[in-house]
A protein has these predicted regions:
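Fungal secretory targeting signals
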Residues: 1-22
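N-terminal leader/pro-regions and domain N-caps
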Residues: 19-74
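Generic short beta-strand segments
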Residues: 61-71, 103-105, 179-184
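Extracellular-facing segments of soluble proteins and assemblies that are Gly/Ser/Thr-biased and enriched
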Residues: 76-128
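Extracellular and analogous surface-interaction loops
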Residues: 84-96, 164-170, 209-211
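Short helix-loop boundary/capping segments
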Residues: 110-164
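Internal, hydrophobic beta-strand segments that form the core of beta-sheet-rich folds
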Residues: 164-189
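Proprotein-processing/basic-patch segments
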Residues: 181-213
Length: 213
């Protein structure tokens, strides 16, 4: 039977700089929502020459299946990443968009004493100094090997959301970059794996918040 283990992953949000509080609601959105105008990929887990990424959903609810995303120790690469570069146009004028929540999942195998750290960092190219990172960790502190599909959703607090440029004219929301990285940690020869198995593959999806500007 195929199942997912839903985990908090000791999640934390790490902003690079404090942001002022603004009035906003995740139920607020422009009358005209943007449509994806371009998507590209980079990173060891989805190289631009052959990304092996399957995208589904519209800009409002994107999901990315990462078929070549794999970390393995001790006989492979302990860390792997995939960065999505996504741009959309057509939003109503006078709005800003920011990443609000991140969901990641995949198949995880950990020997006792091994752990998995994962990171999702987002920023807009128009203001690349402002970033926010969602970070989680899963250790295997038990006495047996862990082998399970895992999933985690983390919400970014309103004060830490990184906002894109204010829309006008073409309704360009900015070039959003979202980097997903995992790192396997061991203190010896333990086995660790994060990737796909027979019926699942690493994937990420996210949701947005909007505010007036």
């Amino acid at each position: 039977m195929h199942s997912y283990l839903s985990l908090p992953f000791l999640a934390a949000v790490l902003p690079t700089s404090a942001s002022p509080l603004h009035q906003w609601s995740n139920r607020s959105a422009p009358a005209s929502l943007p449509q994806i105008s371009s998507v590209s990929y980079s990173g060891s887990g989805c190289p631009s020459s052959s990304p092996a990424v399957v995208r589904s959903g519209a800009f409002a609810d994107p999901a990315f299946r990462l078929n070549a995303f794999e970390a393995r120790v001790p006989d492979g690469t302990s860390t792997v990443n995939c960065q999505v570069h996504i741009q959309a146009e057509g939003a109503s004028s006078g709005w800003q968009l920011g990443l609000e929540s991140v969901t990641v999942h995949g198949h995880l195998v950990l020997d006792p004493g091994a752990s998995l750290d994962w990171f999702v960092t987002s920023f807009f190219s128009q203001d690349a100094d402002k970033t926010v990172t969602v970070r989680g960790s899963l250790p295997n502190s038990g006495g047996q090997r862990l082998s399970q599909d895992v999933a985690s959703t983390t919400h970014i607090p309103a004060a830490n959301i990184v906002w894109g440029p204010c829309t006008s004219g073409s309704g360009d929301v900015g070039l959003l970059n979202v980097n997903f990285r995992v790192a396997l940690q061991t203190d010896g020869g333990q086995y660790g794996f994060f990737g796909k198995d027979a019926d699942t593959a690493p994937a990420e999806s996210w949701t947005y918040a909007w505010r007036r500007c």
